[in-house]
Structure formats: C-alpha cells, structure tokens
Design a protein with these regions (language model features):
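Extracytoplasmic gate region of multi-pass secondary transporters
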Residues: 27-28, 208-252, 256-260
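Helix-breaking motifs and short loop linkers at transmembrane-helix boundaries and internal kinks
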Residues: 39, 71, 92-97, 241, ...
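Conserved MFS/SLC helix-loop-helix module at the cytosolic interface between two early adjacent transmembrane helices
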Residues: 57-97
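Helix-to-loop junctions at the C-terminal end of transmembrane segments
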Residues: 59-72, 261-274, 358
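Cytoplasmic helix-loop-helix junction between adjacent transmembrane helices
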Residues: 102-136
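Helix-loop-helix hairpin linking two adjacent transmembrane segments in secondary transporters
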Residues: 133-185
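C-terminal transmembrane helical hairpin of 12-TM major facilitator-type secondary transporters
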Residues: 272-319
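A late C-terminal transmembrane helix in Major Facilitator Superfamily
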Residues: 329-363, 370
Length: 387
C-alpha cells in the first residue's frame, strides 16, 4: 500500500465508525416524543430494539459473503444507505408499524458492515488505533443525541432529527463511494489467514465453560450499555423532571464518556496493564449505577450516567483483546463470534426487559436494573478469573 493511501485510510476508518455510532444514541432521546406522536406505551421501545436486533443478526450471518461479492467499500456505502432509508422512512411515516419494520432495515444495514469493518481494522491497524476506532463509534453515538435534543427543544420535533440523520448518512455514503479504492485489500488479503491446527471446532468451543461464561459477559455488558443509553433521557425527563435540553445533554454525555474513556484507554494502553483497567471498569460500574439509583436530583443523575459510561468504556475492547488468553488460541475464533452475537442479543433484549419493567414498576426501576446487571457482570468475570 502506498504511503499516500495509508495516510487517508485511517481517517476514513474513523469516519466509518462514526457513521456506525451516529444512529445508536438518537432513539433514546427521540422515544418520549415519538411515543406521544403515536400514542404508544413506554415499553414498546422494546419492539423497535428487538426488530433492530433481528435485522442485525440476519445480516451479520451473511456479511462475510456479501463483502466477498461487493468489497468492503461498496458494502459500507450500502450499509449507510440502508440506515439512511430507515431514518427517512421514520421521519415521514404517519403510522407506528413502519417504525418497527424499518428498524429491521436499520439493523440489516448495521449488521452487514459491523463485523466486516472490524475484521478489516484487525488486519490493518495497531491495537491503539483499533481502540480509537471504537472511540469514534462513541463520538457518533454522542453527536446523534445532541442534534436530536437541539431540534426537539427548538420545536422542530423528532421527525426533523431523523430527516437530518438520513441526509448525513447519505452524504457519508457518497463520500465512501468516492473513496472506494481506499478500502480494497490487496489480492489474497480479503480475509485474515487462519493458522492451520489452531481453531477448534464449533461444538468443542461450545463445550468450553470459559467460552460460555465469556459469551454471557458480552450479553450483560452490551445490555447494560444499551439500557443506560436508551432509557436515560426518559428517566431524567419523565421521572425526575429534568428539562429536555438538560436531559439531552446528559444522554449525550453518557455516550460521550464512552468516547472519552476509549480515547484515554488508547493513550494508556502501553502504560497500564489491560487486566487492571478491566477490573477498574468492572468494579466501578456498579458504583456508578448505585449513584444513578440513589440520586434523584439532576446533577447526581448526570454525574452517575457520565461515570457509568466512562467506566464501561474500556470493557468491550479489553474483553475482546483478552479473549485468546482467556479461552485459548484454539477456541478464540469461535468465541469471538459467539461474543459479538451475544452482545447483539443483550443490546436488544435487556433494554426491552427494562422497558417492560418500567411500564409496571416505574422508570425509577432503571437504576436497580443497571445495578443488578453491572454487579452480575463483575461477579461473573471474577468467578472466571479465579479458575
């Protein structure tokens, strides 16, 4: 690869991860207004999240084959256009059912590219750059709620937020279309080579207690991260009386703290042992969730959410990085596949369960829910670490 091409590839990859994160934080801020528009109960956010999860899983299974046919650059363009189509449909539909249907389309777009672009990054970039790529996802997830909050508080409404999101993703798709050649791998390098005799069988990996435990860790982590992000705005506005503008800032600060935490981890990666950072995040997250539980006032809830995002931030990339050491090189390829699938399930199922609980026990149940999830995450990790 030429030096000029390499210089452009890293910023392009950063932008690609921003595009992946951009839609993820928007829904939690839009949901109170959206459900009032369609007169839906609070827990039906779960229907949307489950539809997205189904689309993600459906496309992620075939993502590798699609990449082989289209190439990563064209797949990235298609992914942006699918999510843009979903956002545009949301902005225009007069009915709730298309919201659920096009959530599936949005999941298709995200699932098709997520694994492929992570695999591309793994073959091209250092661990520090990969961590910063995931930080860029957090940057996108932070920007979405900020824009949606500004539009809602200005009186433009949630529909304009999704229209702007669609336009942004179309612009990104056009930019990626113009830079297709930057994404092409050299001949024979489309897929990382697998060392012979290293990867164990699928059934053998499933029989490993450590693989099963790690899969549950990812389910709980992604579920806790998504639950906090999707329900924070509703909790702060509908239960704690915070203004939409301030609550939107708090929701954005949560996603922003994930961005900041991963950025900081990239800087600390060569100076602090990964295991120490992982334990810091896992032990601190329940304390942050406890702050969310106990502080009913605005500043305390704001601080609790920010601390929770900051402490959750390094867990996902560190768990991925530690997987070969924890389960062995033999099981690592299958284990990582199980973990990503479990994270997708957790990000859909746990926020849906939190919504079901909120409808029956009130939005204040979110704090104890997060506390329980983060405590289970810590206990499960420590139990595995002692083996």
């Amino acid at each position: 690869m030429s030096r000029d091409r390499r210089r452009w590839l890293v910023p392009l990859a950063f932008l690609a991860f921003v595009s992946l994160g951009l839609p993820d934080g928007v829904l939690g801020v839009a949901w109170p207004s959206l459900r009032r528009t369609f007169d839906r109960p609070i827990d039906q956010l779960g229907l949307i999240l489950l539809s997205m999860m189904a689309g993600y899983l459906a496309s992620s299974f075939g993502g590798g084959a699609v990449q082989e046919r289209l190439g990563l650059g064209r797949l990235l363009v298609a992914s942006c256009l699918l999510v843009a189509t979903s956002a545009a449909a949301w902005s225009a539909t007069p009915f709730f059912l298309p919201i659920v249907v096009f959530a599936f389309v949005s999941g298709l777009g995200a699932g098709a590219i997520d694994a492929s672009i992570n695999a591309f990054a793994a073959t091209r970039f250092t661990p520090r750059v990969i961590t910063w790529l995931h930080a860029c996802w957090g940057l996108g997830a932070m920007a979405g709620p900020l824009v949606m909050t500004a539009l809602i508080t200005a009186g433009a409404g949630w529909r304009w937020g999704y229209a702007l999101l669609a336009a942004s993703l179309v612009a990104m798709a056009a930019f990626f279309r113009l830079t297709l050649d930057q994404w092409e791998l050299p001949n024979g390098a489309r897929r990382p080579a697998r060392p012979r005799g290293v990867a164990g069988g699928l059934r053998e990996a499933l029989r490993s207690p450590r693989v099963r435990a790690n899969t549950l860790l990812f389910f709980l982590y992604a579920g806790a991260e998504s639950t906090a992000g999707q329900w924070a705005f509703s909790l702060l506005t509908e239960s704690r009386g915070m203004t939409a503008a301030t609550a939107g800032l708090a929701a954005s600060a949560y996603w922003g703290s994930i961005f900041a935490g991963r950025l900081a981890f990239g800087l600390l990666a060569h100076h602090v042992a990964p295991a120490a950072l992982l334990r810091l995040g896992l032990a601190g997250a329940p304390l942050a969730a406890l702050v969310v539980c106990l502080t009913r006032g605005g500043p305390g809830g704001f601080a609790g959410l920010f601390a929770l995002g900051l402490l959750l931030a390094p867990i996902f990339p560190l768990l991925i990085a530690e997987t070969p050491n924890q389960v062995g090189e033999r099981h690592a390829p299958h284990a990582i596949g199980f973990q990503i699938s479990a994270a997708t399930l957790g990000a859909g199922l746990l926020p849906a369960a939190a919504g079901f609980l909120a409808r029956r026990a009130g939005l204040e149940s979110l704090g104890p829910f997060l506390l329980a999830a983060t405590l289970l995450l810590l206990l499960l990790h420590e139990r595995g670490a002692r083996r």
